[in-house]
Amino acid sequence: MKVTKAEIVISAVRPDQYPGGDLPEIALAGRSNVGKSSFINTILNRKKLVRISSKPGKTQTLNFFIINDMMHFVDVPGYGYAKVSKSERAAWGKMIETYFTTREQLDATVLVIDLRHPPTKDDVMMYDFLKHYEIPTIIIATKADKIPKGKWQKHLKVVKETLDVEAGDEVVLFSSETGLGKEEAWKAIHKFTKTKNA
């Protein structure tokens, strides 16, 4: 998809701050420092729309972006970062749960994981949480450029088995460095968004 407009609308922590309207919405989740910001910047053809932090756990708000005036992307704070306090973790959990369980505009979630390593316990918990609430999920297996091509399928198999991926949930090989999987990611997203303008 050609992205002509991508800008932040609001950083929210409560439902009354979420944007109104009925635009299709895609949430983007993943472990801290997994490459989620790079994924967003790559598929939106933007170098610095989402700041790539060297400090994990930096994003503590739900960041709503409007794309081509047709849909919202929602950058969800990264999970699994050990150095945040218990109270911060509890606040994060409440904010995330509220968003995922009450947001009617949400069409699907992109879950970004690192293809180089088996999914972590936190990745499994996040995927199980999304499945519990019957939220369609697209799994982006990023950093594929860091693995020899001949080993991609082996690593993908580990991802699918560890997460116990449900039928119908796509797993897309991706690299922010090479652009691999960019088109496939958009195709997967468009299956869930109600927009017909793509």
UniProtKB/Swiss-Prot annotation:
One of its GO terms (biological process) is division septum assembly. Mg(2+) binds at residues 37, 59. Belongs to the TRAFAC class TrmE-Era-EngA-EngB-Septin-like GTPase superfamily. EngB GTPase family. This is Probable GTP-binding protein EngB. Keywords: Cell cycle, Cell division, GTP-binding, Magnesium, Metal-binding, Nucleotide-binding, Septation. GO terms for cellular component: cytosol. Pfam families: MMR_HSR1 (PF01926). GO terms for molecular function: GTP binding; metal ion binding. Necessary for normal cell division and for the maintenance of normal septation. GTP binds at residues 30-37, 57-61, 75-78, 142-145, 174-176. The keyword Plastid does not apply. Its cofactor is Mg(2+). Residues 22-195 form the EngB-type G domain. The gene is engB.
